[in-house]
């Protein structure tokens, strides 16, 4: 199994990318890594080249580059070359911690969309109070969506939850402003109707945002605009809560003593709420596994993302989506980009 990795994407590239790669190849003897990026900078950190091949390029996509323009103009960028390796059959999947929009564009324009899937979807696994987590999509690949798109998102998320997260018959829910079938706008009402009347996956109805982290669903479906807002809200709320808790525990002698006893528990709580522990965000709907690692990923974050991609390839997630897509076909599908 060969995995193409963009060594130059992310806040801590290439050091943390390279360290994560070395940890992964040491753990999994069945993988080879193709590292795309500046060979000199990569070699500063690559102390073990076992099953690691460097493909040199000076070009990279910056975090502030306009995604589509960058992908079309920077043909030799590390991210683009990694995707091209997948397209050419030289790698089975690709990973980048770089520009999210550029990676989505690369997945669509270079690797290509699955026939029958109208729109791709970005899907991370988010934390729950039980530590189980849930898959949520779309979190930003499409600002707007149609009911048939959300229907397909449910299928893709369900396949991933079953194959990679090992959940038998995953519970798929639709994010809405109420649990009743009649609640919501035109998009959610029509999506509910389509999802209720299919048998490709287990649809359990609407879910409200306040219940997202309560482990009531394994897959939650929404449009990309709403999903991205929810993700940022969860991130912001979590950070604010931990900050307030820290200030309270450090305010006064008694609180500081209590904090010393609670330190281990608080660190475990912080780790439980860190969704990078589940790996990266999958770009579903393209012809091969494409995963966006968190931009601030350290070596362990890259390692968990490689582990995640390895599972996706091994469990044939993309192939399963391709074989199942006709079960959620509504009328004609849009022409592939």
Swiss-Prot record:
**Can you say where in the cell this protein is located?**
Cytoplasm
Q: What's a Gene Ontology MF term here? A: phosphate:acyl-[acyl carrier protein] acyltransferase activity
Catalytic activity from the UniProt record: a fatty acyl-[ACP] + phosphate = an acyl phosphate + holo-[ACP]
**What InterPro entries does the record point to?**
FA_synthesis, Phospholipid_synth_PlsX-like
Q: Which GO terms describe its cellular component?
A: cytoplasm
One of its GO biological process terms is: fatty acid biosynthetic process
Q: In which pathway does it act?
A: Lipid metabolism; phospholipid metabolism
Assembly information from the UniProt record = Homodimer. Probably interacts with PlsY.
- Tell me which family the UniProt entry assigns to this protein: Belongs to the PlsX family.
Instruction: Show the HAMAP family listed in the entry.
Output: PlsX
Q: What is this protein called?
A: Phosphate acyltransferase
This chain's source organism reads Listeria innocua serovar 6a (strain ATCC BAA-680 / CLIP 11262)
Gene transcribed to yield this protein: plsX
């Amino acid at each position: 199994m060969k995995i193409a990795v963009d060594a130059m994407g992310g806040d801590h590239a290439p050091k943390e990318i390279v360290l994560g790669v070395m940890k992964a190849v040491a753990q999994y003897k069945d993988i080879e890594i193709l590292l795309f990026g500046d060979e000199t900078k990569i070699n500063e950190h690559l102390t073990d080249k076992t099953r690691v091949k460097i493909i040199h390029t000076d070009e990279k996509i910056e975090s502030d580059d306009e995604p589509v323009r960058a992908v079309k103009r920077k043909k030799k960028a590390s991210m683009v070359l990694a995707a091209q390796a997948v397209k050419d059959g030289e790698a089975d999947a690709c990973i980048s911690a770089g520009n999210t929009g550029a990676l989505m564009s690369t997945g669509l324009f270079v690797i290509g969309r699955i026939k029958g899937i109208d729109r791709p979807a970005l899907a991370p696994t988010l934390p729950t109070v039980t530590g189980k987590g849930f898959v949520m999509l779309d979190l930003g690949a499409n600002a707007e969506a149609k009911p048939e798109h959300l229907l397909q998102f449910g299928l893709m998320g369900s396949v991933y939850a079953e194959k990679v997260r090992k959940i038998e018959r995953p519970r798929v829910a639709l994010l809405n402003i109420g649990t009743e079938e009649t609640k919501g706008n035109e998009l959610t009402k029509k999506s509910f109707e389509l999802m209720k009347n299919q048998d490709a996956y287990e649809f359990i109805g609407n879910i409200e945002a306040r219940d997202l982290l309560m482990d009531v669903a394994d897959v939650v479906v929404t449009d990309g605009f709403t999903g991205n807002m929810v993700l940022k809200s969860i991130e912001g709320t979590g950070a604010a809560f931990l900050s307030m808790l820290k200030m309270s525990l450090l305010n006064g002698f008694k609180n500081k003593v209590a904090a010393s006893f609670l330190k281990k528990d608080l660190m475990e709580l912080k780790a439980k709420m860190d969704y990078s522990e589940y790996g990266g965000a999958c770009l579903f709907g393209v012809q091969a596994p494409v995963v966006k690692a968190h931009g601030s990923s350290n070596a362990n974050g890259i390692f968990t993302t490689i582990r995640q991609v390895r599972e996706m390839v091994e469990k044939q997630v993309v192939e399963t989506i391709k074989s199942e897509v006709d079960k959620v076909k509504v009328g004609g599908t849009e022409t592939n980009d």
